[in-house]
């Protein structure tokens, strides 16, 4: 009985007969045919194929599209810095933002502490 069951599992056919010869076991092959999702590059919006796929900060890029926003040098996963969804080489990131001492100001945005100061002023005028 174990030999017949093992033989039934080893045969690629869809039907296998048991040891008595009159019982039939139905077998079906199940294939996982998942539709492949087309991934698009965050930089150029074109299809990214698995061989050229690179993921940085949960965004998908072509290897050739993953470059510094300032100098357009090709980046690697170990040689980039990201801020607000923009990618930079480490030298330009330091040059552009470290000199200011405040990353938000370097990006031309309001300082985070200024946003809180406006809320305190607004709440102070309402209670007074």
UniProtKB/Swiss-Prot annotation:
InterPro entries in UniProt: LIM_LIMD2, Znf_LIM
Q: Name one GO biological process term.
A: actin filament bundle assembly
CDD domains in UniProt: LIM_Eplin_like_1
What GO molecular-function term can you cite, just one?
A: actin filament binding
Q: Which SUPFAM superfamilies match?
A: Glucocorticoid receptor-like (DNA-binding domain) (SSF57716)
| GO CC terms of this entry | actin cytoskeleton; cytoplasm; nucleus; plasma membrane
Main function: Acts as an activator of the protein-kinase ILK, thereby regulating cell motility.
Under the heading PROSITE patterns, the entry gives: LIM_DOMAIN_1, LIM_DOMAIN_2
Spans annotated as Disordered:
1-25
Tell me the ranges covered by the LIM zinc-binding domain, including all copies: 39-99
Q: Which residues carry this modification: N-acetylmethionine?
A: 1
Binding-site residues for Zn(2+) 1, renumbered to this chain: 41, 44, 62, 65
Q: Describe its partners and assembly state.
A: Interacts with ILK.
Source domain of life = Eukaryota
Q: Which organism is it from?
A: Rattus norvegicus (Rat)
**Protein name from the UniProt record:** LIM domain-containing protein 2
One Pfam annotation reads LIM
UniProt binding sites for Zn(2+) 2: 68, 71, 89, 92
Where is this protein found?
A: Cytoplasm; Nucleus
């Amino acid at each position: 009985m174990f030999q017949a069951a093992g033989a039934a599992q080893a045969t690629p056919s869809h039907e296998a007969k048991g040891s008595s010869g009159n019982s039939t076991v139905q077998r079906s092959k199940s294939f996982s045919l998942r539709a492949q999702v087309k991934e698009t590059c965050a930089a150029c919006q074109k299809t990214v194929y698995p061989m050229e796929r690179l993921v940085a900060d949960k965004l998908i890029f072509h290897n050739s599209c993953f470059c510094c926003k300032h100098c357009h040098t090709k980046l690697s996963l170990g040689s980039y810095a990201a801020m607000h969804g923009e990618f930079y080489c480490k030298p330009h990131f330091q040059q552009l933002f470290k000199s200011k001492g405040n990353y938000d100001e370097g990006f031309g945005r309001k300082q985070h502490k200024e946003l809180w100061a406006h809320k305190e002023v607004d709440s102070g005028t309402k209670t007074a």
